[in-house]
């Protein structure tokens, strides 16, 4: 099965962030903003370590009732979050996709693009 990849990029304010993308290029997890490349790379390592275990995911709903999930590290800090989904089942599919793709070691660095 083809794995996805991490896309390391710069946010508009010059901070670093990453997306985990599935093999179909869809973003399945978005990180917080990091002040340094090294911190963002540590965030990727944390997703690789924690993203394969369903107990590290927490389901939530936004104010419009749309479900989404967050991925937490073992210290309970948020590592990344999903988009908003149309149903809890769709959000669960998103978790399954993160679990299937988190271990990838492919990192596409587009900070220089």
Curated annotation (Swiss-Prot):
Spans of repeat Sequence: 11-59, 62-110
Keywords: Repeat
Superkingdom of this protein's organism: Bacteria
Repeat in keyword set: yes
UniProt keyword annotation of Repeat present: yes
PANTHER family named among the record's database cross-references: PTHR40606, UPF0339 PROTEIN YEGP (PTHR40606:SF1)
Similarity-based family: Belongs to the UPF0339 family. Duplicated subfamily.
SUPFAM superfamilies: YegP-like
InterPro entries: DUF1508, UPF0339_domain, YegP-like_sf
Protein's name according to its UniProt entry: UPF0339 protein MS1092
């Amino acid at each position: 099965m083809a794995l996805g990849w991490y896309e390391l990029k710069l946010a508009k304010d010059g901070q670093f962030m990453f997306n985990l993308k599935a093999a179909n290029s869809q973003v399945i997890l978005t990180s917080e903003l990091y002040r340094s490349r090294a911190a963002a790379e540590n965030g990727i390592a944390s997703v690789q370590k924690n993203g394969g275990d369903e107990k590290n995911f927490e389901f939530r709903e936004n104010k419009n009732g749309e479900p989404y999930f967050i991925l937490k590290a073992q210290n309970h800090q948020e590592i990344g979050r999903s988009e908003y989904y149309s149903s809890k089942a769709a959000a669960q599919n998103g978790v399954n996709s993160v679990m299937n793709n988190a271990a990838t070691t492919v990192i596409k660095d587009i900070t220089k693009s």
